[in-house]
Amino acid sequence: REDFQSWFTAEGIRPVKFTRNTNEGRYTATNTYHYMWNAAEPYIAADVYSSSSGQRNVNMPLNACPYDLPALFFLARNMDFDSVVPGKRYPMTFAIDDDIYNVYFILHGRETRKIKGLGTVRTIKFAAKLLAGEVFTGEEDMMIWVTDDDNRIPVWFEAPIMVGTASGRLAEYSGLKYPFSSLTNK
């Protein structure tokens, strides 16, 4: 079970605070980040714990703008995909645990996809680089499909794991800001 929470500015999606609570069987982890933008040398003050590494407090530099995972997904959902070149790698930086990673996403284009429980949906498909670790091999990208409308709701994902593939779908939705216009039929 994973719980990620992110606080960031509306303008520019600049991270302010991030918390992570992970409980996956015998593995547990917590992260609490405070982004210290006003310091002479900006940094992330990170309080990090994992059952495999213990407790530690670290300061990570804010040389670029390392996003946390929820802010990174929010940023990706709000991009102007009409100005993104399909097949081109777009770099992104994010922080997790006590490290900063350089990753990328690649737009694959638009496609219509049947989603169990929803119906047929017009989507935007893109890939995100995965990091090697306890679950992912890091050799393949996670594929993500978001609605091709103003909501940009993630409706499906597939991610290769050590043994097999993890996948997930949107099961239900409510309170959308915009009409679900990419849903072509139920």
Segments (PLM) and residue ranges:
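Active-site/ligand-binding surface loops and adjacent short beta/alpha elements
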Residues: W37-I96
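Acidic, serine/threonine-rich low-complexity disordered tracts
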Residues: R1-A39, D80-K186
